[in-house]
């Protein structure tokens, strides 16, 4: 019997994996880690006696979740992406299934916060979960502030600097940092100095990133229209004004020098991957815009189904031809 952790390849996914590793280590369990993104195929073989944790991630299309659930002995899914949670609920309603996957799925918090809650509470009642989520360790809360965009409503939030501090680390180092953090927290160490040091590192790196991003945007950013094709029963496409950029390293902060909320609905970053697919990220600060829903529609309309994420940040995979020939129209062309 082997314990596996399948996790997303971003800060929230790495933090979730580190948290899970710390708690499993207290039980004498050393898990096998599988870093995933939506453009990757899970090719690993799982045994019928294995335990699988899927953290801050879901396999797409959703049938792959069902296939893995039916393969292994224990299947725990912890996620916070509203679009896929709603898809799961719709499948349950459509098929009339009364059972559900073990785990914790709740919008408004990050995967790391939910992972912390899951391992801390033997009774996973919603009341107990909400109570614990209000008292997560500071570093895990900062991950949530960043990943769910709560930081945008917090004056002088330290979440962006905290996230930036990990940009210089390998995935293994990030996972190890959070595993150590949680282990010491469980052993009642005071971690304030460690957290402050990490934030200060991030502040220094942010100064460099601001200058670098501003220079990058001068040659990479352009104004465009995003044409989102609705389901076939809807009357017409919806058109959004976007500031788009061809960029390998993404994040809404990269657009700081060119994003104008009074002109742009969405920030759109895209990159051609070595798989032959184009990964697209969407960001918005407008309350009336749901990037998760838009990403799902764009992904499903193209050659590769799937896509989604959060209201303020989401993504999908497509082809270069579909992105530049159908979805995105550069202003002036």
Language model region names:
Residues 172-209:
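Long, charge-rich alpha-helical interaction segments
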């Amino acid at each position: 019997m082997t314990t596996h952790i399948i996790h997303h390849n971003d800060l929230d996914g790495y933090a979730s994996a580190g948290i899970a590793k710390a708690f499993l280590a207290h039980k004498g369990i050393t898990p096998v880690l599988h870093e995933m993104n939506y453009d990757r195929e899970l090719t690993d073989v799982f045994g019928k006696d294995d335990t699988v944790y899927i953290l801050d991630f879901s396999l797409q299309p959703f049938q792959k979740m069902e296939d893995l659930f039916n393969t292994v002995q224990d299947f725990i899914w912890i996620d916070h992406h509203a679009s896929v949670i709603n898809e799961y609920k719709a499948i349950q309603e459509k098929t009339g299934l009364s059972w559900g996957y073990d785990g914790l799925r709740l919008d408004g918090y990050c995967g790391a916060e939910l992972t912390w809650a899951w391992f801390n509470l033997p009774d996973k009642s919603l009341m107990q979960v909400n109570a614990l989520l209000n008292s997560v360790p500071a570093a895990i809360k900062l991950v949530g502030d960043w990943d769910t965009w709560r930081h945008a409503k917090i004056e002088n939030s330290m979440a962006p600097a905290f996230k930036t501090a990990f940009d210089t680390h390998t995935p293994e180092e990030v996972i190890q940092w959070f595993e150590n953090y949680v282990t010491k927290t469980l052993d009642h160490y005071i971690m304030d100095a460690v957290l402050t040091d990490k934030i200060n590192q991030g502040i220094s790196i942010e100064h460099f990133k601001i200058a670098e991003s501003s220079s990058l945007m001068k040659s990479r950013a352009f104004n465009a229209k995003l044409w989102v094709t609705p389901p076939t029963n809807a009357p017409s496409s919806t058109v959004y004004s976007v500031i788009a950029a061809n960029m390998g390293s993404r994040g809404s902060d990269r657009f700081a020098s060119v994003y104008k909320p009074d002109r742009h609905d969405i920030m759109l970053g895209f990159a051609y991957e070595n798989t032959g697919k184009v990964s697209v990220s969407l960001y918005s600060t407008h309350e009336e815009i749901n990037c998760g829903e838009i990403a799902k529609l764009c992904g499903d309309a193209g050659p590769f189904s799937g896509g989604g994420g959060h209201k303020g940040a989401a993504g999908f995979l497509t082809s270069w031809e579909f992105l530049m020939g159908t979805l995105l129209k550069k202003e002036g062309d």
